[in-house]
Amino acid sequence: MRYYSFWDRLVFCIDEALPVMQIQRCSAVTRPSPAEGLIPHESVLSKEELQLSGSLMRINHVGEICAQALYTGQALSASSKDIQKKLKKAAGEEIDHLNWCEQRIHELDTHVSYLNSFWYLNSLLIGLAAGLWGDKVSLGFLAETEHQVERHLCKHLQKLPLQDKKSRAILEKMRQEELEHALTAEHAGAVPLPLVIQWIMQSLANFMSMVAYRI
């Protein structure tokens, strides 16, 4: 098996980041959107409801960008090849979510966040730092991230207009899979993060949501 150095992995990381930071859809879509085949209901949504759905989906799109960057950063600094593989797998599985959200954003006639490059780079650095604390902490970081995303998606499902069935189908599928990712990390040996770290993570997520809602 070929050994990849830190610098090899860094080059791969930059190559994977470019489509995201240039706000282009990733090409590695492996599954159709859960909303595919559903009848659009945009015509029955008011202007305010369309704006609400678009803003919520933009937040979720940014959330997927951050998750992908976090896991890529952690994989870059992880010492165990097995953990690197798990983290890269988690990052890859977020690509579908990323594209589902972006497709829906365009259908709602709005835009992705103009700060995608900032969100990605910031999360990548956090992931790099988290990976230096060891493999079990990396898995704990993955599990906590997924649990927070799952709770966040539950709140958005409550806020979505009732008639926006396409966005709802996407978020419900994402919620199920984020929970599965968290449980997989826990079963692999993740250690719970200190409450203060959980609080900091939640505060950063709240800041991201507030900004991405508008830009």
How would you name each of these model-derived features?
Residues 1-215:
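Non-heme di-metal
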